[in-house]
């Protein structure tokens, strides 16, 4: 039996959706093929890589991609992670379930380097917690 497809989307496929893809592969990988993309492709943020490494998830081989309409149309579940992606996400066929899990963009955090780093860790943990809830409840 083929796996279901989950597609995580955000603006630049740099931080939030990359972290979601990493968590998704770790937590949902038995039942789901996990992908991520952005409205634009900004490249992997080094702090996203570092934050995920702290929880033993390696995302260095993931790529920053724009939305692939083939994956979008084959997906079972599409999750937008920011308002921009929610507003600009292309139409999907009726069978594709869509949901919005909003998280702040850690790349836009203000303050000292330490404060900015803390935001990356917090967003990483919130995304991981949300995916764990999804794994248990399907919602």
UniProtKB/Swiss-Prot annotation:
Domain of life, per the record?
Answer: Bacteria
* Keywords of the record: Arsenical resistance, Cytoplasm, Disulfide bond, Oxidoreductase, Redox-active center
> Which regions span the lipid bilayer?
none
Q: Extract the signal peptide range.
A: none
Entry-linked Pfam families: LMWPc (PF01451)
Give the GO cellular component terms, alphabetically. Answer: cytoplasm
Any S-S bridges, and between which cysteines?
Answer: 10-82, 82-89
Record-level Gene Ontology MF annotations: arsenate reductase (thioredoxin) activity; protein tyrosine phosphatase activity
SUPFAM superfamilies attached to this UniProt entry: Phosphotyrosine protein phosphatases I
Chief location of this protein?
cytoplasm
- List the PANTHER family hit by this protein, alphabetically: ARSENATE REDUCTASE
**HAMAP family from the UniProt entry:** Arsenate_reduct
Function of this protein? Catalyzes the reduction of arsenate [As(V)] to arsenite [As(III)].
Instruction: Spell out the protein name for this chain.
Output: Arsenate reductase
The species this protein belongs to is: Oceanobacillus iheyensis (strain DSM 14371 / CIP 107618 / JCM 11309 / KCTC 3954 / HTE831)
């Amino acid at each position: 039996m083929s796996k279901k497809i989950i597609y995580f989307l955000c603006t630049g496929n740099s931080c939030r959706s990359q972290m979601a893809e990493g968590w998704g592969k770790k937590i949902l990988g038995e039942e789901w093929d996990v992908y991520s993309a952005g409205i634009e492709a900004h490249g992997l943020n080094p702090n996203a890589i570092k934050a995920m490494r702290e929880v033993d998830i390696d995302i260095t081989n993931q790529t920053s991609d724009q939305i692939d309409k083939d994956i979008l149309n084959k997906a079972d579940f599409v999750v937008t992670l920011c308002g921009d992606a929610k507003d600009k996400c292309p139409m999907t066929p009726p069978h594709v379930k869509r949901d919005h899990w909003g998280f702040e963009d850690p790349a836009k955090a203000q303050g000292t380097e330490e404060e900015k780093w803390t935001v990356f860790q917090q967003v990483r943990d919130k995304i991981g917690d949300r995916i764990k809830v999804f794994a248990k409840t399907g919602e």
